[in-house]
Every structure is written in C-alpha cells, then in structure tokens.
C-alpha cells in the first residue's frame, strides 16, 4: 500500500480548492505533506496553520526529498518543480490519481456531473454525518458547518467530487457513484463530440465493482441517453414518478425547500417521507435526492436524512448568503455569492433567488469564465443574463486563454442591449466592481455576485466598503 512506500508528498498548486482538500486529508493520515503556489489564499493559510509547509512560488528545490509530486490541471509541464521531479525520477501524478489512492483507504462515493457536484457532495457528507457514519470528505468548496473543504473521518466512507472537466474522474474506483446531470461543457476534452462525452460518463460508472451502485438523475436528457448502455447496478432519481426516488409537493418556504420524497427503489422499503432542505432552488431538490439515495444505500435512517438536510449550513460560494450591506443612499441590500459560470447552473440559481426572495429586485454582477465558453455558449449566456432586473458585467476571466474576438463581456453587453429589456453596465476591471455596485443598488435589492474567477474577491471588498458608510 502507498503508506508503506510513500512518506513525503509534494503538491504543485496546493492552494487550488481540489488540491488543498486532498493535501489536508493526507496530512491527517500521517503523511508528510508540502506544497507550493504562486499566490497566497485562504486555503494556503489554512494548510500552513495545520503545520503543512507551503512555499510561495515554484522552484526546483521544493521537490527535494519528495516521494511523489501531485499536480493540478492548471500546472504546466514546464513548471520548474515538475521538470526537477522528472529529472530526479520522482513520480509526477495528477490530483485525481492521488484522490483514487485515497479511496483505497475508504469505501469511495464519487459525485460526478456537469453541475451540482459540490452541493451534492456536501449534502451527502452532511447526511452521513447526521447518521453517525463520520465520513471523510473532499469537496470543491468549503463546507460551512465544518469550516473546511476536507476532513478525515473515522468512518468507512469517503465522499468526493469526481471531475469530468479533464476526464480525470476515470482514475477513480468508487463503490458508489452519482451523476447529477450531463451538459455540453469542457467539450475540448472530448473532441467536441457528445458521443465521447457520453462514453466518458458510462466508463466512469463502470469503474465501480459489480457490487457497487450508481444514482443517476433522469431529469437530465443526456443521462437518460446513456442509461441503455449502463451495465452496472443503478437507481434513478428525479422529479418524475418513474424514477426510483422522486420528489413531489415541492414548496419554497423562504430560503428553504419543503418536499415529499418517494422511494420505490429495489431492495429498499417502499414509502414516502417529508423533508425540509435548508437551501433554495428546485435544482437543489434534485441534488438532495441524490444524497438521499446514497444515504439510504448505506443504511441511514429517515430521521438522519431529515436532520442532515434541515441542518445543512451550505457550502462556500454556492448561494452563500453574506447578509445585508449598507448602501450610500440609505437602506440595505442582501449580498449572495455563487460560483455559477455555465448558463444552465446560472438559470437554476437565478430561479432559486427569485423563488426565495419574491419581492426583491434581482441585481446580478457576473464575470464570464473563459473566452471559449463565452464563445461556445454566447446565445445561452445572453438569454439567461437578460432575465435579471439589473446587470453589471465585468470582463471575462481568461483562465490562461487568449482573448477571442466577439466573445468578451462588451459583446455580451451589446447583445443584451439589442434585446431591449436591460441596459447592462460594463465594468472592465473587477477591482472597480464593489464601488460600482454600491452606486447601482437600491434599498431592498438582492445582489448576486456570480462567477468562477477573480470575482470571488468582490464580497469581502463590498462588505469592507459598506462598513465605511
């Protein structure tokens, strides 16, 4: 096993949300963990507080003494630490391969899907915790109740996100898997072929042993398309009563969702029960159904499921409520932060905001993520952005890409303006966004700060400015 052969593990890009969680769990398992990153952030500070050596920047000396070097997809092969490791014949592996090794220590539950992975993983961990199963978890966002995105539990299960963006989820060998949905995103990875995208998810499901079980959402058209090709045991979930687990009587109760769960899953007691989910949105009802399916499969009680969903405190940057901020002209606005950056998940989050806060004017501050995504989904972005009451667009977060003509925020603003409903406000520099928002907001508004790039710094800056008023 790895523990008998490996002592020192070095992470290149340790501050990334996927990397930091794995590093923390390995540290808690007793490995000597170190890492490096170009930028300090909350994750690197947290790891440092645990006693993990985190180096600023990347130099060859950082890998000296390492038994293995772990890299994120953002790390280039020209990185000096990667080059030095290869020269010293130190194995260099992707983070997904190290996550796969972690799953050798526990029974793995892997959550895949284009949207909803982080929330579903968090809900699953919450319910398993409420059931006394004390799971290990590695999540792509901070679980608010735990104050971290990873935790080493004493129980037999590890719950983790499975990343399809680079097909690295095919390294994992879980005993249970979830597919929340399949959408056409990260299509460069799949040669812009829907067939290859479908096959990757089929292969992911087939990574389970014969005694495993998958939970598949039949509300997703692409998931329904792969069902005939899935040969491993699976159960379906969704809002349709043909699913093995489905929901009815769905109600918005403020920022919560109340619904009835119906179970007609083979090998389980048939019946129904009511739950209250402590977060808004019909899309989160689906995420909760996936977590409920996994929980029932591992033997959690209905009471534990109800407790885990009602007590769920959310996850960082997934409809994360910061509370009211003061406005210069008097009054307050409710600040909510969200990671959404694909039109489908944005539409779901905006609908959740509308349902939870019916009387409020909805103001969206959005930073598109990647020029290629903006180009490929331009019309979809235009449609979803046009559904809010006021819109502030900041420039595309490139994520290492070169700009593409007519695939930037100015082009989006022009296209939305032509539709005649909104007059988008363009903010070229994200650093100027907090002050601009304070001048746009009105008393009683909800402002949704959304995107997967540097816009994540806006809430803290906006709160700081607001306190000076």
Curated annotation (Swiss-Prot):
Gene name in the database record: murC
Enzyme class label: ligase
Functional note: Cell wall formation.
Pfam families (alphabetical): Mur_ligase, Mur_ligase_C, Mur_ligase_M
NCBIfam families: murC
Keyword Nucleotide-binding: yes
Species of the source: Neisseria meningitidis serogroup B (strain ATCC BAA-335 / MC58)
Cystine connections: none
The name this protein goes by in its record: UDP-N-acetylmuramate--L-alanine ligase
